[in-house]
Every structure is written in C-alpha cells, then in structure tokens.
C-alpha cells in the first residue's frame, strides 16, 4: 500500500511541475520596511586612533567658579548648600563627583539650571556631616 501511495504522490508532483503557484503576500502599506538583518559587533584589526583623547571634562573644568551673591550666601548659611557656576556640558553626576574630588565633601543632591546668559548654575546640597559655611570659608568665597 505504501509504495503505491508514494508512487501516486510522485506522479501527481511530476504532473504539477516544479514551478507551482506561489501565494502572493498582500501589501497593506505603501511604506517599505527594510528587514532587520544580522548586525555583528565590530572587532577591529587595529585602533583607528593612535592616542586616546585626554579627558575633556576633569574636576577643575567642571567647576568654573563659586557664586557669591546675596541669595547664594543665604543658601550657604541657611540651606547647607554651595552654589557654583559649572561647565555647560557637565551633568549632575559629574558635578557631584567633582565637588567630592576638589573639596572632599559629600553632596546629598545637585540641582542645576541654565541661566539666561547661557551659563549653568549648580546648587550642591551637602550632607549633614558637613557645614557649607566652613567649606565656603575654606574655598575662600566668603
């Protein structure tokens, strides 16, 4: 029984031919989406740069200058907060680590704003272990 069904299936396939009908996929959108292909990670044979670039933002470049206005002094005295002008490209994490590196104090959090003149101002709230007034005296802007 098996050989005859196999033979009849082969006969049917031979009559049908190899170029059968292919079901066409109906496109419902006019935009063609490129299929996602395999993207291998790069493994370069040699470095393209002979020497890596120096650190563009170190602690001394991040903190530009302390701000010693009356409102900033009020923040120092009452809010345990230091106020600095910082580099426009620096972020809060970089500012926090720069203050730790330069002045050996831990910051609780950092608030930043960009002033109308295009510079960035940072309010660095210190932890209760440190006194902002002492740090400001040590820095020399009081």
Swiss-Prot record:
Subcellular location(s) of the protein: Cytoplasm
Keyword RNA-binding among UniProt keywords: yes
Keywords, comma-separated and alphabetical: Cytoplasm, Ribonucleoprotein, Ribosomal protein, RNA-binding, rRNA-binding
SUPFAM superfamilies for the chain: Ribosomal proteins S24e, L23 and L15e (SSF54189)
GO CC terms of this entry: cytosolic large ribosomal subunit
Molecular functions (GO terms): rRNA binding; structural constituent of ribosome
InterPro entries (alphabetical): Nucleotide-bd_a/b_plait_sf, Ribosomal_uL23-like, Ribosomal_uL23/eL15/eS24_sf, Ribosomal_uL23_CS, Ribosomal_uL23_N
Domain of life from the UniProt record: Eukaryota
Keyword tRNA processing: no
Pfam families cross-referenced by the UniProt entry: Ribosomal_L23, Ribosomal_L23eN
GO biological process terms, semicolon-separated: translation
Major subcellular site: cytoplasm
Protein role: Component of the ribosome, a large ribonucleoprotein complex responsible for the synthesis of proteins in the cell. The small ribosomal subunit (SSU) binds messenger RNAs (mRNAs) and translates the encoded message by selecting cognate aminoacyl-transfer RNA (tRNA) molecules. The large subunit (LSU) contains the ribosomal catalytic site termed the peptidyl transferase center (PTC), which catalyzes the formation of peptide bonds, thereby polymerizing the amino acids delivered by tRNAs into a polypeptide chain.
UniProt-listed PANTHER family: 60S RIBOSOMAL PROTEIN L23A (PTHR11620)
Known partners and oligomeric status: Component of the large ribosomal subunit. Mature ribosomes consist of a small (40S) and a large (60S) subunit. The 40S subunit contains about 32 different proteins and 1 molecule of RNA (18S). The 60S subunit contains 45 different proteins and 3 molecules of RNA (25S, 5.8S and 5S).
NCBIfam families tied to this protein: PRK14548.1 (NF011118)
Family under the similarity heading: Belongs to the universal ribosomal protein uL23 family.
Name of the protein described by the UniProt record: Large ribosomal subunit protein uL23
Organism for this UniProt entry: Candida albicans (strain SC5314 / ATCC MYA-2876)
């Amino acid at each position: 029984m098996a050989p005859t069904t196999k033979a009849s299936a082969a006969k049917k396939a031979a009559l049908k031919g190899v170029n059968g009908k292919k079901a066409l996929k109906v496109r419902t959108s006019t935009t063609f989406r490129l299929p996602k292909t395999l993207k291998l990670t790069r493994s370069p044979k040699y470095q393209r740069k002979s020497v890596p670039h120096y650190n563009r933002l170190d602690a001394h470049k991040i903190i530009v200058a302390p701000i010693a206005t009356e409102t900033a002094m009020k923040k120092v005295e009452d809010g345990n907060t230091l106020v600095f002008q910082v580099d426009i490209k620096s972020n809060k994490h970089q500012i926090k680590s720069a203050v730790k590196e330069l002045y050996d104090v831990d910051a609780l959090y950092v608030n930043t704003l960009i002033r109308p003149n295009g510079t960035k101002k940072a309010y660095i709230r210190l932890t209760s272990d440190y006194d902002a007034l002492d740090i400001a005296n040590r820095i020399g802007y009081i």
